[in-house]
């Protein structure tokens, strides 16, 4: 409540009680103010009441919740079921615009603000998790495989002659299909057995680059988190190789945010060589429902280019 309404409340209930309630609410508002000011992940998690207060404050900023509003335009948030509306805290519009997922939606100031804050907080989390030099990221409503496809499709505009993606093998279908769906031919590099671990065959990767011609290779598609006995790819060496041959490098970091080792490998790879983007799943790392991912990178302009590719 604003100060005028609180003053009116004091005419109905004892002013001392109203002041206590006002102070309690101010505690919630201070947390929200800190988030708006810093755009970083809170050191201590919010209570559900603070989260719900904030979401409701944002929701009333969207035009579908304006009092007396009747949306009849092409881009209106309309939901038939009140159950569905409540489930989404009446944030009905969605985010972005048809040309850019990162753009502000004019009729949804609250949803747009929530999106900007989400990307800012997630960027902070990636830095805290070990990738200190990450420059930009954004959340997409797609699982990891489709998010990788989006990265490959963006690279197509930069490397129109490229047909191949060099991929150290991992036995998981979605990352394999992500390359085929984007229209490229995966060049599968078998791993080598080192002790009781399967590791990246760097010699074969380099030989494939030389055989195919660097200009015909869209990127190297490496992996951090995977199933035993395979260990994370040798990101530092691959990143150095990509820098040497001027080939993009996309990292499948599906499970990796929760692993300091995986995040360290990405940071080191970017430091010594080239990593253009790395993709991680929301459900695996943040324990939310399946169907979201984070696309991040070290060149802000390239990450923005990917976001503008989102249809």
Task: Write out the residue ranges for each language-model feature.
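Conserved N-terminal alpha-helix of the aminotransferase class I/II PLP-enzyme fold
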Residues: 2-146, 265-266
């Amino acid at each position: 409540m604003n100060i005028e309404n609180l003053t009116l409340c004091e005419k109905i209930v004892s002013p001392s009680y109203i002041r206590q309630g006002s102070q309690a609410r101010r505690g919630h508002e201070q947390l929200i103010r800190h988030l708006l000011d810093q755009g970083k992940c809170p050191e201590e998690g919010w209570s559900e009441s603070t989260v719900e207060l904030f979401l409701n404050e944002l929701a009333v900023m969207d035009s579908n919740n304006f009092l007396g509003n009747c949306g009849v335009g092409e881009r209106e948030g309309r939901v038939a079921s009140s159950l569905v509306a409540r489930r989404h805290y009446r944030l009905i519009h969605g985010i972005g615009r048809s040309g850019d997922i990162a753009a502000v939606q004019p009729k949804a100031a609250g949803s747009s603000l929530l999106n900007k804050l989400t990307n800012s907080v997630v960027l902070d989390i990636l830095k805290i998790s070990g990738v200190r030099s990450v420059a930009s990221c954004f959340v997409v409503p797609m699982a990891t495989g489709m998010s990788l496809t989006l990265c490959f499709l963006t690279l197509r505009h930069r490397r129109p002659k490229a047909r191949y993606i060099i991929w150290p093998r991992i036995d998981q279908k979605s990352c394999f299909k992500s390359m085929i769906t984007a229209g490229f031919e995966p060049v599968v590099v078998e791993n080598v057995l080192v002790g009781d671990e399967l590791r990246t065959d760097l010699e074969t990767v380099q030989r494939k680059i030389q055989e195919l011609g660097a200009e015909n290779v869209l990127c190297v598609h490496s992996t951090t988190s995977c199933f035993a006995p395979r260990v994370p790819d040798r990101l530092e060496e691959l990143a150095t190789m990509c820098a040497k041959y001027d080939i993009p490098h996309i990292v499948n970091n599906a499970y990796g945010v929760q692993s300091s080792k995986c995040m360290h490998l990405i940071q080191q790879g970017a430091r010594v060589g080239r990593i253009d983007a790395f993709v991680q799943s929301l459900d695996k790392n943040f324990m939310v429902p399946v169907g979201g991912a984070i696309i991040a990178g070290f060149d802000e302009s390239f990450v923005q280019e990917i976001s503008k590719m989102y249809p």
